[in-house]
A protein has these predicted regions:
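Short gly/ser-rich loop at a beta-strand->alpha-helix junction or flexible surface loop bordering the NTP-binding
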Residues: 1-165, 197, 301-303, 310-343
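Surface segments flanking catalytic/ligand-binding clefts of nucleic-acid enzymes
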Residues: 146-343
Length: 343
């Protein structure tokens, strides 16, 4: 009897560096062969097989999220949490990782959690899935990785999903995502700058995150490499925003060369620190500069908009007590983050 791993359990398998080789070689399951049935009597054996397959203990696996069809016995236990699915199954919903063991794809996980996560949390999840990091219970607060999906793939998957819980919120969130973030701070900064005013953002144009800039010969001589990847790039405005986080303090000379190379090729460079983001006056000056460069007219914000903006920044930006020496950050751990044993 097959099991279909879903929700947070599926995310942890998908995003764990320890399990990346298993996921890398998994193939999409045949949509016509999917039948969401799990016999309770066969679950114990399936969990044991899954632990052997993953090379982890049942304690490391944690309580397993499984998705089942409506009408299937689904009394949750200390080992298993069942989730009912009654709508049509979207195409590309599962990866087959072994005989009888299926894993929800990143796109399907996003849809599953859209029914329960607040919008901002869903946006942060989407940015991580489309980026090259994932929140984890580690000192940094995240692990590096490779993108498991893209905004294009996620949007296409959600377009195919019909009549299911969370679909409207998932589609709304996907419209605000951008590929390529390398850290939670990049995602947070992007959302503050680009989300609509009605959601607390500044409504600026979406930049490219960590996109490739090919340097001229002169700029290459300065930087030492033919290309560089700015944190936030507004291509039409020739504007770059560089976040001064932990990497800057490790190698400030390299960042200075980056700035000189970009300016040599005509880019305007704006540096941003966590302190500036937390200071409303400094943040607004940065926003005005981006708006001017991109041709965005800034309208006065009502009291309601200002309140939403403060609430958004309070949710996305680490508190002052979580800023460590050298502007290193300690992020609040989300419940769907990787546990330490899988990071």
């Amino acid at each position: 009897m097959a099991i279909f791993i879903s929700h947070a359990s599926a995310l942890r398998v998908l995003m764990s560096p320890r399990l990346s080789s298993l996921v890398r070689y998994a193939r999409l399951a045949d949509d016509d062969a999917i039948a969401l049935k799990s016999e309770p009597s066969a679950i114990d054996e399936s969990i044991s097989r899954l632990c052997v397959l993953l090379g982890i203990s049942e304690i490391e696996l944690g309580r397993l999220d499984l998705i089942v069809g409506r009408g299937t016995s689904r009394k949750s236990t200390s080992r298993v949490r069942y989730h009912s699915w009654s709508g049509p199954m979207p195409r590309g919903a599962f990866l087959r990782i072994s005989d009888g063991i299926y894993l929800s794809t990143p796109e399907f996980c996003f849809l599953q959690l859209a029914g329960s996560l607040p919008m901002i949390d869903l946006l942060l999840l989407g940015m991580a899935l489309c980026g090259s990091y994932f929140p984890a219970d580690t000192e940094r607060g995240f692990v590096d990785g490779s993108p498991t999906t893209s905004v294009r793939k996620l949007t296409a998957f959600l377009a195919d999903a019909k009549r299911c819980k969370g679909i409207d919120q998932a589609r709304s969130a996907a419209a605000h995502l951008v590929d390529g973030a390398r850290s939670p701070m990049e995602s947070s900064l992007l959302l503050v700058l680009t989300l609509p005013r009605t959601m607390g953002g500044f409504g600026l144009a979406k930049p490219t995150l960590n996109g490739t800039v090919r340097l001229s010969d002169g700029a290459r001589a300065i930087f030492g490499y033919p290309i560089l990847r700015p944190d936030l790039l507004f291509p039409g405005a020739m504007l770059v925003i560089e976040y001064l986080g932990r990497a800057f303090h490790k190698d400030p000379e390299r960042d200075i060369r980056r700035e000189l190379a970009l300016r040599h090729d005509g880019f305007d460079v704006q540096f941003v620190s966590i302190g500036q983001i937390m200071d409303s006056r400094q943040l607004y000056e940065i926003v005005k500069r981006v708006a001017s460069a991109t041709g965005k007219k800034m309208r006065p914000a009502s009291a309601a908009i200002v309140a939403k903006r403060f609430a958004l920044i309070d949710r996305l930006i680490p508190k002052r007590e979580n800023i460590l020496d050298g502007e290193c950050l300690r992020y609040e751990r989300t419940w769907w983050a990787l546990p330490k044993c899988l990071a």
